[in-house]
Amino acid sequence: MFKSGFVAILGRPNVGKSTFLNHVMGQKIAIMSDKAQTTRNKIMGIYTTETEQIVFIDTPGIHKPKTALGDFMVESAYSTLREVETVLFMVPADEKRGKGDDMIIERLKAAKIPVILVINKIDKVHPDQLLEQIDDFRSQMDFKEVVPISALEGNNVPTLIKLLTDNLEEGFQYFPEDQITDHPERFLVSEMVREKVLHLTQQEVPHSVAVVVESMKRDEETDKVHIRATIMVERDSQKGIIIGKQGAMLKKIGKMARRDIELMLGDKVYLETWVKVKKNWRDKKLDLADFGYNEKEY
């Protein structure tokens, strides 16, 4: 008998949702940074064994939106409640429950589907603090299970996976066993470039960046994959920061991104990066759609 199911990973920004998904999948399919709202699109991670398939849906961190992009991200996250059989509600062990958590809990109660509370970052707290956190969240909602983990170190992750697989129902194998995500390579390439911008820039720049892969094709002469990517920003000052003195920052972004892209593709890559200004794109629906943030996602 083959079992399968869809599982959403929900929570506030920066609680470790993408770190958890990457750990389960054994490779990077969701970019990570210490900046809030790193994940902007729903990202599917397909975990398959001989007898089971769990389709995880990593979601943008739920926050109070200030732009049309923020609205898209939050609606995209909540839309998964209509698509899954189980929700992993992830919270950090080293932060007390806040208004953002309460807002999510109210939506989860209304959804009327099983919710597993996943308390991440247990490596950062004393066991007594962890017990207090569990009691506090349990007082707010009747969770199906509570599982403390460290997504970064992998502590207790196998326990969580076993809990999910034990509760799967008989079903189809929705995806081939060698497929690990639903996103095309172009999307993953654009995310890897954006990840390096997030790592290397500060203040308002990370939130104002989108990356569009203009072309991606193999050069038969050099046997390299030639990629042309444009980094979009909202202001000229941001363009200057990303390019850097004599192009140094842009070169660094390109060099770091190329390494990750080559690992993912298993090919040598020639990465060409450009920077363009598109004023206030985060509040323009046409621009959002052009840059891959389309309401059709939800």
UniProtKB/Swiss-Prot annotation:
Residue stretches spanning the membrane: none
Region G5, residue ranges: 149-151
Region (G2), start-end ranges: 37-41
Signal peptide residues on this chain, from the entry's feature table: none
Sequence ranges assigned to domain Era-type G in this UniProt record: 3-170
Renumbered residue ranges of the record's region G3: 58-61
Single Gene Ontology BP annotation: ribosomal small subunit assembly
Ranges where the record places region G4: 120-123
GO molecular function: GTP binding; GTPase activity; ribosomal small subunit binding; small ribosomal subunit rRNA binding
Gene3D superfamilies: 3.30.300.20, P-loop containing nucleotide triphosphate hydrolases
GO annotations of cellular component type: cytosol; plasma membrane
Stretch list, region G1: 11-18
PANTHER family the UniProt entry points to: GTPASE ERA, GTPASE ERA, MITOCHONDRIAL
Protein name: GTPase Era
Species annotation: Streptococcus pyogenes serotype M5 (strain Manfredo)
